[in-house]
């Protein structure tokens, strides 16, 4: 952003008083890094710490941020404020030093709320679909020339970044319910895609508590704001009478205000019509597969229609939508001859979905778009508690693939729970007689194991939220070819 654009922005969004240097503890996370990127572009001095470099820290370094790959007290001593992610423990030396120095320590969502405070905020909440819906809304507003600021939990591929500072009053942000921190936000428009039992440790294991928290979030809207809610989701539908704000519903349901009709999928694209109250029928080509993405698009269209964005801009944005990182992310199609000597090729897709509902949506999209392909999944369960709580659901959905390679559970810092591990899950799936899962304890051996199994026209889905994305990128880099053993490499 140039000086003239920043000056224009300052007429809308004033600077934070007495804040010059902002330090982020855990800056490499997508949500943290996105906020840091926006603030860096606004002209604030940014520093942060994390355990290892990644694309987020590299991007921030390129913007002039100071990044430390260690946590030390001296990192924070010049800071005006310290921003922390929920992954950071209370005894972190930087947090301890900040408190001793009486430097304000705030959560990520509080800083996001500050960014939103003087803007027209659009917050996207829900158990599934937040990242893609946020990207779709951002793409439509950008196509319409509204130059929004956006802060997303995943890479917006068209922009090549998780976040971007725009010069207008619009801020589009993913709202995180995992730690209930979305209650800090006070948007003008709020989308709720769906509500399922996830992150229940935050809500004391009480689903009613989770539902009430979503109600409280929606009541952060001003009385003239608008809630955009997916009426297909039974929990969202149940909550409608309790929401004391203007509501637009969307979905496949007959009573939806924005209704999806005549959906069909051809390869990676969805084709459908949208009926809207007092508006012409909209014929949509969506460059994203699956009925779940049609729902995400309907939410984005509902918001854009309410804002008065021209239908032509909406349709262009959806037809040209480039997707988000690790959401049915097509990494290539590779010939099998150098992999295992077979003819034909195999497709490689990377997907972040780690809840049974998300995995099921990915599988349905794959089956609908490529009905003749064999589905080969490399799956990494995420968290022992989630595996335990949704054990039967995981067993059911994973039994739908044709070939299953399962990595060990990505613990995310949790202690192992007996019976909620990958070996147990493989055993349960095997006992159902539909397929024989392969437990892969060493992720480095995935290319070699896959090479023995792959056939022409396979679709390989690398699925999960832990570090399995690195496996997907490695497979793409290797073009699915197994790595040569050291002795072969040296000609022994």
UniProtKB/Swiss-Prot annotation:
Binding residues annotated for ATP, in chain numbering: 126-132
Similarity comment: family membership: Belongs to the MurCDEF family.
Pfam family, one: Mur_ligase_C
Pathway recorded for this protein: Cell wall biogenesis; peptidoglycan biosynthesis
Domain of life: Bacteria
Protein's UniProt keywords contain Ion transport: no
Protein name stated in the entry: UDP-N-acetylmuramate--L-alanine ligase
One Gene Ontology term of the molecular function aspect: UDP-N-acetylmuramate-L-alanine ligase activity
Signal peptide (UniProt feature, chain positions): none
Keywords: ATP-binding, Cell cycle, Cell division, Cell shape, Cell wall biogenesis/degradation, Cytoplasm, Ligase, Nucleotide-binding, Peptidoglycan synthesis
GO cellular component term, pick one: cytoplasm
Compartments it resides in: Cytoplasm
Species of origin: Serratia proteamaculans (strain 568)
The UniProt record lists the keyword Transferase: no
Reported function: Cell wall formation.
Predominant localisation class: cytoplasm
Entry EC no(s): 6.3.2.8
């Amino acid at each position: 952003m140039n000086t003239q654009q920043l000056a224009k922005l300052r007429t809308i969004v004033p600077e934070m008083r007495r804040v010059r240097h902002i330090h982020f503890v855990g800056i490499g996370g997508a949500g943290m890094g996105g906020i840091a990127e926006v603030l860096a572009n606004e002209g604030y001095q940014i520093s942060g710490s994390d355990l290892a470099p990644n694309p987020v820290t590299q991007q921030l370094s390129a913007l002039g941020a100071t990044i430390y790959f260690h946590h030390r007290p001296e990192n924070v001593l010049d800071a005006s404020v310290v921003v922390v992610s929920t992954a950071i423990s209370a005894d972190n030396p930087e947090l301890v030093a900040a408190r001793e120095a009486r430097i304000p320590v705030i959560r990520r969502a509080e800083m996001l709320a500050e960014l939103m405070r003087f803007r027209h905020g659009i917050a996207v909440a829900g158990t599934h679909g937040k990242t893609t819906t946020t990207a779709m809304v951002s793409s439509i507003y950008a196509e319409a020339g509204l130059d929004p600021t956006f802060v997303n939990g995943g890479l917006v591929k068209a922009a090549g970044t998780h976040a971007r500072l725009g010069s207008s009053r619009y801020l589009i942000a993913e709202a995180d319910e995992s730690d209930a921190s979305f209650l800090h936000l006070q948007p003008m428009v709020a989308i709720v895609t769906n509500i399922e039992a996830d992150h229940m440790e935050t809500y004391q294991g009480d689903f009613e508590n989770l539902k009430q928290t979503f109600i409280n979030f929606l009541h952060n809207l001003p009385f003239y704001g608008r809630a955009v809610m997916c009426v297909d989701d039974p929990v969202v539908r149940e909550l409608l009478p309790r929401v004391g704000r203007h509501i637009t519903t969307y979905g496949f349901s007959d009573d939806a205000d924005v209704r999806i009709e005549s959906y069909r999928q051809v390869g990676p694209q969805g084709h459908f019509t949208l009926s809207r109250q007092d508006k012409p029928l909209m014929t949509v080509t969506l460059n994203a597969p699956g009925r779940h993405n049609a729902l995400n698009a309907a939410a984005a269209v509902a918001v854009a229609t309410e804002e008065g964005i021209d239908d032509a801009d909406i349709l262009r944005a959806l037809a040209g939508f480039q997707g988000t990182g690790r959401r049915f992310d097509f990494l290539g199609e590779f010939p099998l001859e150098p992999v295992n000597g077979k003819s034909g090729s195999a497709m490689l897709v990377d997907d972040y979905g780690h809840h049974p509902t998300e995995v099921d949506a990915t599988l349905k999209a794959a089956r609908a778009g490529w009905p003749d392909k064999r589905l080969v999944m490399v799956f990494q369960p995420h968290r022992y508690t989630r595996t335990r709580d949704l054990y039967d659901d995981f067993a059911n959905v994973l039994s739908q693939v044709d070939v299953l390679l399962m990595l060990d559970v990505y613990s995310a810092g949790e202690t192992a729970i007996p019976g909620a591990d990958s070996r147990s899950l493989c055993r349960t799936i095997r006992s159902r007689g539909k397929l024989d899962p392969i437990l892969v304890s060493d992720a480095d051996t995935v290319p070699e194991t896959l090479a023995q199994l792959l056939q022409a026209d396979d679709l390989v889905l690398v699925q999960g939220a832990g570090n399995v994305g690195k496996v997907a990128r490695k497979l793409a880099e290797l073009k699915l070819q197994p790595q040569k053993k050291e002795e072969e490499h040296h000609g022994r």
